[in-house]
Amino acid sequence: MKEFLIAVDAEDRPLHAVDKMNAHREGVLHRAFSIFLFDTQGQVLLQQRALGKYHSPGLWSNSCCGHPRPDEETGAAAVRRLHEELGLQCALQPVAAFLYREAVSKELIEHEYDHVFVGIARDLPQPDPREVREWRWLALPDLHHELARAPAHFTIWLHRIAERFGAEGLQSWRAHALAAS
């Protein structure tokens, strides 16, 4: 079954629906989201993508990411995917948005207007093995060290988020999530 995404312009205005695989083959700018879940001890939840994923399999990434469906609100899509991938339900707060374009393989390009959401996880993940191979908590100050130590083990969008917003940005997102929970 084909999956459709929302093609957008550089200001995140919707243009039309686009087939997910075509969007990634052709590098079509589309709407996406990235979720960062924190615990109350200052750790961030990372997931290792399942080996069967069509791109970036086996790489470590932020807590959850995905795309809204056409006619689906981005925040609602983030809540939906968090439950589908990790079996978690929690309040999510929008904290940032940015645009990036990166090749993720010889054939596929991520060109996303990425909305970043944060939340506090109070339960343990119950991941769908088709989506998530493993998960782990990492002390937030260690994230940038891990990205530098083993860059090939992490998704390109996690690198771009860490570069763009820095350790201070992620710390402020955690504080924002705690204040909102």
Model regions and ranges:
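Acidic, metal-coordinating catalytic segment for phosphate/diphosphate chemistry
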Residues: M1-S34, T40
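Conserved active-site beta-strand-loop modules that form the wall/rim of enzyme catalytic pockets
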Residues: G42-L45, A91-L92, H115
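Nudix hydrolase/Nudix homology domain
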Residues: D19-M21, G58, A96-R101, L108-S181
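Histidine- and/or cysteine-centered catalytic micro-motif in compact active-site loops
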Residues: T40, R49-L51, A97, R122
